[in-house]
Amino acid sequence: MRLLKSHPLLKLVNSYLIDASQPSNISYLWNFGSLLACCLIIQIVTGVTLAMHYSPNVLEAFNSIEHIMRDVNNGWLVRYLHSNTASAFFFLVYLHIGRGMYYGSYRAPRTLVWAIGTVILILMMATAFLGYVLPYGQMSLWGATVITNLISAIPWIGQDIVEFIWGGFSVNNATLNRFFALHFVLPFILAALVLMHLIALHDTAGSSNPLGVSGNYDRITFAPYYLFKDLITIFIFIYVLSSFVFFMPNVLGDSENYIMANPMQTPPAIVPEWYLLPFYAILRSIPNKLLGVIAMFSAILAIMLLPITDLGRSKGLQFRPLSKFAFWAFVVNFLILMKLGACHVESPFIELGQFSTIFYFSYFIFIVPVLSLIENTLVDLNYLK
């Protein structure tokens, strides 16, 4: 018997990456998983390397970043890899979620996979926010102040929780220390959740396919077919990431963060990283602080409603024209929210943000179930002819 199939550890690798049977018709849209695994590996390796040279102290944090950039051998490369791969990570995660929404990957028996994926997304956002604070530039300090202050919206105990998180009465040395500790440990928890995500997928029904039908009729092994298919997109990903790292490393960042944190001077606009902008826009669209915070967290958790609200008989939207149109309208609306999150809080951006927020929640609560029922009815009427 081959060692791959007899060794207690290697047979696990074999069952997941070599002999795992996959539907023969899955497209390149199913390659995001391997790309996201690459992103996580890059982030952990570069993150641990950066941690060796970083000083989590309000007096030294900004200077330690400059030390990494100027004095550490290839420190600039490690830092730019870390910051740009974070953007790539979120870009690919949004594509991964969009593919799952379009092809109905949240439907039974993969509901647990979808739920674990949602937890991974929330943890990613928390990790990214903590990491954005660490360079301790202007946007780091004021971003941390604004976002942590959201917790003060909780009645009675909110302000006490905020001061507990800060370790004082404002963002200070204790805050930076605990943010660094959490930012270091969360990616490893994320890696454990990714393994749970894979186990849940492997032990339920395996990968879905573009037709939304059972893939048991025609399956092929993961290696060498999909292994080489994944390698193609991995090489493309490395090429695109390299073009950002070497030629435009700061294009996705904020120039304000190259100014040392100054508690006495507020930046002209406090804006989070681009991948958090849609949820920031939803937060700002609601005048009430507590309701805005609830709406922001609900916007992330809203994707958990899809297994319940999608009542369509066919899996996925590829054969459902009304739902397909609504899905692409939702994608456009999400991009509009992303743009609005970077705009100043003034007319007409406030009104546009409120309209986009209403549409965002309407999609999950009303549009998906109503269109599902209409399409089911149209199928029934056609069948009765």
UniProtKB/Swiss-Prot annotation:
* CDD domains xrefs: cytochrome_b_C, Cytochrome_b_N
Q: Which InterPro entries match?
A: Cyt_b/b6_C, Cyt_b/b6_C_sf, Cyt_b/b6_N, Cytb/b6-like_sf, Cytochrome_b, Cytochrome_b_C_euk/bac, Cytochrome_b_N_euk/bac, Di-haem_cyt_TM
Q: Which residues lie on this side of the membrane: Mitochondrial matrix?
A: 1-27, 103-110, 206-224, 310-320, 366-385
Q: How does it assemble?
A: Component of the ubiquinol-cytochrome c oxidoreductase (cytochrome b-c1 complex, complex III, CIII), a multisubunit enzyme composed of 10 subunits. The complex is composed of 3 respiratory subunits cytochrome b (cob), cytochrome c1 (cyt-1) and Rieske protein (fes-1), 2 core protein subunits pep and ucr-1, and 5 low-molecular weight protein subunits qcr6, qcr7, qcr8, qcr9 and probably NCU16844/qcr10.
**Single GO BP term:** mitochondrial electron transport, ubiquinol to cytochrome c
The record's catalysed reaction(s) read: a quinol + 2 Fe(III)-[cytochrome c](out) = a quinone + 2 Fe(II)-[cytochrome c](out) + 2 H(+)(out)
E.C. no: 7.1.1.8
Q: Which family does it belong to?
A: Belongs to the cytochrome b family.
Report the cofactors: heme b
UniProt keyword terms in alphabetical order:
Electron transport, Heme, Iron, Membrane, Metal-binding, Mitochondrion, Mitochondrion inner membrane, Respiratory chain, Translocase, Transmembrane, Transmembrane helix, Transport, Ubiquinone
* Topological domain spans for side Mitochondrial intermembrane: 52-74, 136-172, 248-288, 342-348
Indicate how the chain sits in the lipid bilayer: Multi-pass membrane protein
Q: Which domain of life is it from?
A: Eukaryota
- Positions binding heme b b566 in this chain are H96, H197
> Which parts of the sequence bind heme b b562?
H82, H183
Binding site residues for a ubiquinone:
Y16, H202
Q: Localized where?
A: Mitochondrion inner membrane
**Gene Ontology terms, cellular component aspect?**
membrane; mitochondrial inner membrane; respiratory chain complex III
Q: Name one GO molecular function term.
A: metal ion binding
Give the main EC class.
translocase
Kindly provide the name given to this protein in its UniProt entry: Cytochrome b
The record describes how the cofactor is bound as:
Binds 2 heme b groups non-covalently per subunit.
